[in-house]
Amino acid sequence: MGGEAPEARRLDRAMSFGGAGSIPEEALHLVLGYVDDPRDREAVSLVCRRWHRIDALTRKHVTVPFCYAASPAHLLARFPRLESLAVKGKPRAAMYGLIPEDWGAYARPWVAELAAPLECLKALHLRRMVVTDDDLAALVRARGHMLQELKLDKCSGFSTDALRLVARSCRSLRTLFLEECSIADNGTEWLHDLAVNNPVLETLNFHMTELTVVPADLELLAKKCKSLISLKISDCDFSDLIGFFRMAASLQEFAGGAFIEQGELTKYGNVKFPSRLCSLGLTYMGTNEMPIIFPFSALLKKLDLQYTFLTTEDHCQLIAKCPNLLVLAVRNVIGDRGLGVVADTCKKLQRLRVERGDDDPGLQEEQGGVSQVGLTTVAVGCRELEYIAAYVSDITNGALESIGTFCKNLCDFRLVLLDREERITDLPLDNGVRALLRGCTKLRRFALYLRPGGLSDTGLGYIGQYSGIIQYMLLGNVGETDDGLIRFALGCENLRKLELRSCCFSEQALARAIRSMPSLRYVWVQGYKASKTGHDLMLMARPFWNIEFTPPSSENANRMREDGEPCVDSQAQILAYYSLAGKRSDCPRSVVPLYPA
């Protein structure tokens, strides 16, 4: 939205005359029905008015990457036959407590437009937005009779009262997604009503919420919803789920629950999972409970062990029994030894996530930790990998080179170097990063959060030079001077979204770099050499480019949170983005809109 398509996707305007202009309207409708990539769609719409109109009439899905980038009324008027709409709200940093609660991203302007004109809308996905009970009531009134998919991902502001209204009124729901939402629990009736009124329900997810679960309601859900294939819930003791598992014959994916009384073998001995289950994520599972997975471990395609109490040895034993895994999520307690088992066993693995574990140094020494050794082993052994996200305690250029050499299908790579080790083996990582980017030519998303000295100006220049088709980047503690940032910006021809943290760059250099990146649509920065007013940021001012500055709070300048991170408002932030909606009207006092003024 709001920018030119990359050169390779330009279509000749002359095509609309003579050859392309003679194509029957029905044929164009049919052909465009098979064009889903939004960048291809954008290129089509720029050919001529006729193609622009047909694109508008045939567009079935739109993702708004930032809720303030477009006017709800204008966007929905342009695409009157949308079947699904996704809107993203607060910056990703909100997931890590770096954005104030009152920052904005209110769903109301969007919900208010979802009325009669959108007769085809069946699916709505809101991410990191503030959604109230009134918003959901308005949505039910407007779209409840047609809504088949409602996803509220990491949203806040609503209660189970609104969920009960959704459950009673939206009787065609196939998907209800509420993962990591902050929901006021006013009772469990919503789940009972959902089971009674939605027999076609296929996916229900309220994982990582604090909602109360009544086992009888889950059993009713299994009885009434014969097509239920995916269920992710909040904490509920596994001994209370035996009846549900017995009745949920179609279930293929389950996550949540809890082994509340660990070590009670007799209590959980009767837990039997459905025969079709191939995706599993268990909570609070320890060594003694692990054997309940063994009977069907060879059938598992997805396994999430992030919220278990398993040791390194437990990971090794369990993963050795899972040769068909496509997706694996663990904490770094898996250690290099565990990743060695992954490399030997999981030859089909496509996605690997290694999250940060316990920060207790003693525990890390006992259980291991992930370093260049484990990453290298996985790169060599799991050559189908498309996604790697890992928190590591040590890393080398050689490990990154191995990933570039062997992981040719990699589309998304994210690495965070933890600061618990005093010395890192091999810094800076300039040559390793260059080798990875040159080797992994399919990369579209790239994140690198290092420690001071982790990447020199030369390495930062390599990222720009070899960024290829990368559209999203998160960089932290990279570069040495403003010169490195300018060299980085000379590349990045296809970069659309950039996030920077803990960097040494000046406001002036940031503004110059941002202005010089041709495809950039969104940038968020925290922790840089900020001025009190952000005046140098005006160097990047241009039409349709909103600039918001959050000055540091003098009161909290040196205050730290309990986890050792700076307070939310102790460091200046920049948010700049293309917008066809103009200046937003709901900025909190902590945010200063610089442009448009």
UniProtKB/Swiss-Prot annotation:
Domain F-box span(s) in chain numbering: 22-64
Record note on quaternary structure: Interacts with TIFY10C/JAZ8 in a coronatine-dependent manner. Interacts with TIFY3/JAZ1, TIFY6A/JAZ3, TIFY6B/JAZ4, TIFY10A/JAZ6, TIFY10B/JAZ7, TIFY11A/JAZ9, TIFY11B/JAZ10, TIFY11C/JAZ11 and TIFY11D/JAZ12 in a coronatine-dependent manner.
Gene3D superfamilies in the record: 1.20.1280.50, Ribonuclease Inhibitor
Keyword Plastid annotated: no
Disulfide bond among keywords: no
Misc note: Plants silencing COI1A and COI1B show increased plant height and seed length, are hypersensitive to gibberellin, and display reduced sensitivity to inhibition of seedling growth by jasmonate.
Annotated positions binding jasmonate: 92, 353, 391, 414, 501
Top-rank taxon, per record: Eukaryota
Annotated GO biological process: defense response; regulation of jasmonic acid mediated signaling pathway; SCF-dependent proteasomal ubiquitin-dependent protein catabolic process
Function recorded in the entry: Involved in jasmonate (JA) signaling. Required for jasmonate signaling in plant defense responses. Can complement Arabidopsis coi1-1 mutant and restore jasmonate signaling. Component of SCF(COI1) E3 ubiquitin ligase complexes, which may mediate the ubiquitination and subsequent proteasomal degradation of target proteins, including TIFY/JAZ family.
Full protein name: Coronatine-insensitive protein homolog 1b
InterPro entries: COI1_F-box, F-box-like_dom_sf, Leu-rich_rpt_Cys-con_subtyp, LRR_dom_sf, Transp_inhibit
Tissue: Expressed in roots, shoots, leaf sheaths and leaf blades.
The entry's keywords: Jasmonic acid signaling pathway, Plant defense, Ubl conjugation pathway
GO cellular component, one term: SCF ubiquitin ligase complex
Organism of this sequence: Oryza sativa subsp. japonica
